[in-house]
Design a protein with these regions (language model features):
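Extracellular glycan-interaction patches encoded by glycine-rich segments
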Residues: 123-143
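Beta-strand signatures of extracellular beta-sandwich domains
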Residues: 55, 99-101
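Short, solvent-exposed beta-strand-to-loop segments that form ligand-recognition rims
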Residues: 102-128
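Extracellular glycan-recognition modules
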Residues: 2-57, 91-94
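Short, solvent-exposed loop/turn segments that connect beta-strands within catalytic domains
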Residues: 61-65, 90-96
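Surface-exposed loop/edge segments in extracytoplasmic proteins
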Residues: 43-45, 63-69, 106-111
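Short tryptophan-centered beta-strand motifs in secreted/extracellular beta-sheet-rich domains
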Residues: 22, 78-89, 100
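Short, aromatic/His-centered strand-loop micro-motif at the edge of beta-sheets
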Residues: 57-82
Length: 143
């Protein structure tokens, strides 16, 4: 079981546009965080396996302003997955504000579909700790 993660402290920058990309291979079926930006318990951004779907969520003032979960299941322990999350909350159309791609295919069948409001601060580039492969000492990515 994994018990380590990478951390860095983000600096100020845009909080409305970003692209996250990772190649991952799961070793088990538990909930695991790929990326977690912990601005505070009230303001954070995360990308995770939940446990076999891919979820992306932003909390702002303790309310979920974005929550997307794929309907497709990703549970093959021998498969590599290329995951891309593209966010641009400045877009006029809500479904263009956040997109999840797996192995080059946009995931349009979603079990959770709360898109961010236009120009929403997504809390992913604030001066706070960014965790890659975990969530503040827990939910490590095991892969």
């Amino acid at each position: 079981m994994a018990s380590t993660q990478l951390t860095r402290t983000a600096t100020s920058g845009t909080n409305t546009k970003a692209t996250f990309s990772a190649w991952v291979k799961k070793a088990d079926a538990n909930e695991q965080f790929l990326f977690y930006h912990f601005g505070s318990s009230a303001n954070n951004f995360r990308i995770r396996f939940d446990p076999d779907t891919i979820g992306v969520q932003t909390l702002s003032s303790s309310s979920s302003v974005m929550h997307l979960n794929t309907s497709a299941k990703f549970r093959d322990p021998s498969a590599w997955y290329h995951i891309v999350v593209a966010i641009d909350s400045t877009q006029a159309t809500d479904t263009n504000r956040a997109k999840i791609y797996v192995n080059g295919v946009q995931q349009t069948s979603l079990s959770a579909t709360t898109y961010p409001p236009q120009n929403q601060n997504m809390h992913f580039n604030e001066s706070a700790t960014v965790y890659i492969g975990g969530q503040a000492g827990s939910n490590y990515f095991n892969g």
